[in-house]
Amino acid sequence: MKLSDIADNAGARKKRMRVGRGIGSGKGKTSGRGGKGQTARSGVRIKGFEGGQMPMHRRLPKRGFNNIFALDFVEINLDRIQQAIDAKKLDAGSVINAEALVKSGALRRAKDGVRLLGRGEITAKVNIEVHGASKSAIAAVEKAGGTVKLLAPAKDEGEAA
């Protein structure tokens, strides 16, 4: 058997239909696009238009609002902190806070604060300062001999008292 003997199975590759090549082809003149007008032209369709039927975005009611005072916490799991400690990017002896996590590369940014979650295990005795923590995360850190201190979220300067 040679490389030139290898071929596709019969019917595996269908030939492309050449449109606009005479009425005898069955795909001449309008090339299967129907009559004239907007739908015969190329380009972007009208977003959300459903052919005159009431579109989905108008059929469904408005719901909810965006709370401008909502705080956006970055979540980090215990296994990620343990990985950073094992890789010598975090010092288990010093306090682990948002600044230390960003500096070590465990987090990209701290946003409005950090929330500790309990996925994975932590074996190092660590002192963690975060803005929020799950019960399982606190229990796991304390089981390893460490502590979790919860901080108040940082308030904006322009916020009313």
Swiss-Prot record:
Coiled coil: none annotated. GO terms for biological process: translation. Pfam families: Ribosomal_L27A. The gene is rplO. Residues 1-43 are annotated as: Disordered. Residues 21-37 have a biased composition (Gly residues). Part of the 50S ribosomal subunit. Keywords: Ribonucleoprotein, Ribosomal protein, RNA-binding, rRNA-binding. It comes from Bradyrhizobium sp. (strain BTAi1 / ATCC BAA-1182). This is Large ribosomal subunit protein uL15. GO terms for cellular component: cytosolic large ribosomal subunit. One of its GO terms (molecular function) is structural constituent of ribosome. Binds to the 23S rRNA. Belongs to the universal ribosomal protein uL15 family. HAMAP family: Ribosomal_uL15.
